[in-house]
Curated annotation (Swiss-Prot):
UniProt keywords, alphabetically: Cytoplasm, Elongation factor, Protein biosynthesis
PANTHER family: ELONGATION FACTOR P, ELONGATION FACTOR P (EF-P) FAMILY PROTEIN
Alphabetical list of NCBIfam families matching this protein: efp, PRK00529.1
Pfam families in UniProt: EFP, EFP_N, Elong-fact-P_C
Name this protein carries in UniProt: Elongation factor P
Function: Involved in peptide bond synthesis. Stimulates efficient translation and peptide-bond synthesis on native or reconstituted 70S ribosomes in vitro. Probably functions indirectly by altering the affinity of the ribosome for aminoacyl-tRNA, thus increasing their reactivity as acceptors for peptidyl transferase.
Family: Belongs to the elongation factor P family.
Cell compartments where the protein resides: Cytoplasm
Pathway of action: Protein biosynthesis; polypeptide chain elongation
Length: 186
């Protein structure tokens, strides 16, 4: 059992009514009067829906035991993403709504890890950094480095990130998948 005050982003837990929830954001909140509460943004792992809720810090939940296996992203068709276990060659179908954030960072044939809760496939874990190519960005302007604000760039997966002014279309970039931000040129 884990207390609500110990839940952090990325953790998965089971509620008293059997829902499997993943924490997207968690913060302590102390109102002017009354007790501290934990405000959380959660995703129902099975349905893919996200919602905001509050818990008392002392509320207890069962922490979900999540196992991972190495896999490869094959392709997406309609509302389903297809993955293959690289050890057993078993294929898994995952609804896109459950992995839409992760799909922003991976291309076909990318290595990932499939997450299981018991025998149920619940999601995909991508590497902390990936290399993606810039498909579209504004041209560089001489002397524009003084502001340092950067410019938006569209990557080959459709993800838009803010990049420095010297980045041009066609360049490969290292992207942080946790924050969805530019790290460096590859």
């Amino acid at each position: 059992m884990i207390e609500a005050s110990k839940l952090r982003a990325g953790m998965t837990f089971v509620t008293n009514d059997g829902k499997l929830l993943k924490v997207l954001e968690a913060s302590h909140h102390k109102p002017g009067k009354g007790n501290t509460i934990m405000r959380m943004k959660l995703r129902d792992v099975r349905s893919g829906s996200t919602f905001d809720t509050s818990y008392r810090p002392e509320e207890k939940f069962e922490q979900a035991i999540i196992e991972t296996v190495p896999a490869q992203y094959l392709y997406q068709m309609d509302d389903t993403a297809y993955f293959m276990n690289t050890e057993t060659y078993d294929q898994y179908e995952i609804p896109v709504v459950n992995v839409q954030e992760e799909l922003k960072f991976i291309l076909e044939n990318s290595d990932v890890k499939i997450q299981f809760y018991g025998t149920e496939v619940i999601g995909v874990q991508v590497p902390t950094t990936v290399e993606l190519t810039v498909t579209e960005t504004q041209p560089s302007i001489k002397g524009a480095t003084v502001t340092g604000s950067g410019k938006p760039a569209t990557l080959e997966t459709g993800l838009v990130v803010n990049v420095p002014d010297f980045i041009e279309a066609g360049q490969k970039l290292v992207i942080n998948t946790v924050e969805g931000t530019y790290v460096s040129r590859a």
